[in-house]
Amino acid sequence: MLKRLKGLLVLALGFTGLQVFGQQNPDIKIEKLKDNLYVYTTYNTFKGTKYAANAVYMVTDKGVVVIDSPWGEDKFKSFTDEIYKKHGKKVIMNIATHSHDDRAGGLEYFGKLGAKTYSTKMTDSILAKENKPRAKYTFDNNKSFKVGNTEFQVYYPGKGHTADNVVVWFPKDKVLVGGCIVKSGDSKDLGYIGEAYVNDWTQSIHNIQQKFPDVQYVVAGHDDWKDQTSIQHTLDLISDYQQKQKASN
């Protein structure tokens, strides 16, 4: 416990320089993580409880790349207006990390703005079955992108929170966008597991660790992304869930 607390203190000190922007919409918060990389957090209610959803956007010399989308269409315009106000650039690309509304919900909106929209073929198949708006462009599980002066990689680690969850890696900044396969350090459980593959989840997390051993920051999909124990905590939550399931059988 003491070791964990010391680690959290060091990490907290590392975040003291984060710049938080004041937004007109109280359900949107934007924080600068790296030179051109920003974490945006939006809030919505699920089964009567308010949750935070985290994702990132990258400002490039060509325009803004948005990973996932604000959680709730009532926040879409406020979000893109805020981006243009801060950076004087438009969103030119949007990538959904899986099919749920807090990730793929903005595909149609961003597409109408003229942005190129992307998802994996697996995510596209799920969205098609659910009669939901889909990305214009699809790719197999893994893909490297270069937008202007920025390179990043989409990686499929395996099943976990959903069958189609992917993560996004920004190598220059050593930032991993974990999406919902990575639980925040303050999560009490695995959250919504109605479409989860819990027995595959551990290996998928190990695949992430092996693929990206030099991560500096992990942005978890929900709640406190600044607690950088999220990867290990996710493994602990999976183990706890499996032990409880075994005990109940």
UniProtKB/Swiss-Prot annotation:
Gene3D superfamilies: Ribonuclease Z/Hydroxyacylglutathione hydrolase-like. Substrate binds at K183. It catalyses: a beta-lactam + H2O = a substituted beta-amino acid. It is found in: Periplasm. Its cofactor is Zn(2+). It comes from the Bacteria. GO terms for cellular component: periplasmic space. Keywords: Antibiotic resistance, Hydrolase, Metal-binding, Periplasm, Signal, Zinc. The keyword Hydrolase applies. Zn(2+) 1 binds at H98, H100, H161. Zn(2+) 2 binds at D102, C180, H222. GO terms for molecular function: beta-lactamase activity; zinc ion binding. Residues 1-22 form the signal peptide. Its EC number is 3.5.2.6. GO terms for biological process: antibiotic catabolic process; response to antibiotic. Binds 2 Zn(2+) ions per subunit. It is an enzyme of class 3 (hydrolase). The keyword NAD does not apply. Its main location: periplasm. InterPro entries: Beta-lactamase_class-B_CS, Metallo-B-lactamas, NDM-1-like, RibonucZ/Hydroxyglut_hydro. Confers resistance to the different beta-lactams antibiotics (penicillin, cephalosporin and carbapenem) via the hydrolysis of the beta-lactam ring. Monomer. Belongs to the metallo-beta-lactamase superfamily. Class-B beta-lactamase family. This is Metallo-beta-lactamase type 2. It comes from Elizabethkingia meningoseptica (Chryseobacterium meningosepticum). The lineage of its organism: Bacteria, Pseudomonadati, Bacteroidota, Flavobacteriia, Flavobacteriales. The gene is blaB5.
